[in-house]
Amino acid sequence: MILDTAKIPWIPKTQIENAALDLLAQWGKFSGQEIGSPIPVEAIVEKYLGITLEYDNLDEIIGIPDVLGATWVDEKRMVINSFLLDGREGRFTFTCGHEVAHWVLHRKFLLHQTEDAFISGAKNNPAVVCRVSASKTRGEWQADYFSSCFIMPGPKVQEAFYKVFGGNPLVIYNRKSCFGRNNPIVLDPSLDTAHQIAKNVMDAGRFLNVSREAMAYRLEDLGLLINETGLLLSSGFKMSKPFPKRSKGKNLKNVAT
């Protein structure tokens, strides 16, 4: 049985962010360490949440394409598609945070769904399966936002931004910089320099395991980067490599789309 994330109830952004910060605070108390970047997502998953974290070819395990991650609630098992280990650390970390979000925010809905299935006599193996093609559903958006707040905590991002750029937000009016995309002396806020703005913040805050694109969108969400172009911030980034095509494997019993 797979959780239908399109049917997840609405959760306010502030509640999602608070849930992410609460988890970080719990980890800090558990580990006795100050919360700092990079956020040790894998350690939090395994040592604090007690979830088994694995890396495997999910296309073959589940039998459906474009799966980034999956979590089996009853088994306390989380599996990340092994292709993300191939030099995609930012996307890998974000996907781990995304799966953590499903555990923190959504597992109660899956367990409730499981109880209903048990009463009706249906067999089930409760799972949350995250596909690229389903990234726009309400529950998947919530998981993405949680991951962003979790691996890039607002206070830490703000601290790093102020260290580099001062107390005022940067406003983007143009698609292209007047001084060139990679000018080493002048950084003109524009869509094609958003990647460099993000990198400067990442370097200052030691956000070593996040992508530039994810950081740029986090800066925008925090009101530190204001995009007045009417275009998406991602239009200034190089296109990510497409999800690799793999042969379709055998379906995992009791897991359906």
Label the model's feature ranges.
Residues 1-257:
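Active-site hotspot residues in diverse enzymes, especially metal/ion-binding acidic/histidine motifs
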